[in-house]
Amino acid sequence: MTSHMDHDDIARKRAERARRKLDQSQNVSASTPDTARCEKPAVADREWMHINHDVAVEQDARRVRLVSWNMLAQSLVRRELFPGSDCLKLKTRLPGIVAEMTSHDNDLGCFQEVDSINEIAPSIRQAGFDFVYERGYEEKKHGLMIMWKTKASTRATFESPVWKKVVRLDDVDKWGDTVDGPSLSRCTRNILLIVALPFSSGPGGIIVATTHLFWHPRYGYERARQAAVIMRELSSLRAASQEDWSSWPIVLAGDLNDQPHSSTYTLLTGQAAQYRDQIRTDLMASRV
């Protein structure tokens, strides 16, 4: 009997604590003005650094603004590490994701680790953009996106791509030959996405490429190999194609998973001859 009364008493105390907690939260909510709750931005406001602000531009040149970042795929969220963190849920992240993609007065966007595409796409199109999205591999859960502005703007807007290519970086060696199975022994499932976007008004356009290179910090050789494949692909557009768009400016933006002191960066910026010995020492350690 005593044990039964103890359990009842504990249950009543728990219920009372829960009621008081609910009352407190309702009082706080009621005392907060609606405008304060509704005006909270989806993303933090940040100041951007202006670069090349005073560079002379040809009179008939077009200016475009491109943003690029890794979206951090929802499919890669480790909820078991943060079981109480509701900020990792898609319904919480989604407004911020869309705001970051569309609210920086950008004309173009290159994004990596994009998934939940059915949830993101309607908001992107409503904001005046269209996009192409590719995973490259059926078993891969996230992919690359190139986004362009379609709504009238004081700068550039774009029509749908006149050309698109997806390159599976595992399937091509650095000299351009197709390989039987993954190149060397790494299976990375990394890809390159390229589109040729014509301007909505007037002649010309822009070729936009994005990629997400191999992530592991120990394997610099694989990143350098993938970068070589990418540069060969982009260079071949100039040499092989007879299309008008092949002469358009090319922009490569993406997540290279690397740093400015790396061999990959040195190779991409044309400094290989100056640092040949250092590059060889760095890359041979991770070559398979």
Predicted regions and their residues:
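Eukaryotic serine/proline-rich intrinsically disordered regulatory segments
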Residues: 2-10, 17, 24, 43, ...
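N-terminal, active-site-proximal structural segment of metallo-dependent hydrolase catalytic domains
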Residues: 1-126, 136-143, 281
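Metal-dependent phosphoesterases centered on the DNase I-like endonuclease/exonuclease/phosphatase
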Residues: 218-288
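Structured beta-strand-rich core segments of catalytic domains in phosphoester-bond hydrolases
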Residues: 36-59, 63, 108-215, 219
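Generic structural signal for small/hydrophobic residues in well-ordered secondary structure
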Residues: 69-70, 97, 101, 147, ...
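Glycine-rich phosphate-binding loop signature in dinucleotide/nucleotide-binding domains
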Residues: 103-105, 199-203, 237-247
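Active-site metal-binding loops of divalent metal-dependent hydrolases
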Residues: 71, 114, 213, 254-256
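Feature marks short, surface-exposed loop/turn motifs that line or immediately flank catalytic pockets
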Residues: 73-75, 214-217, 260
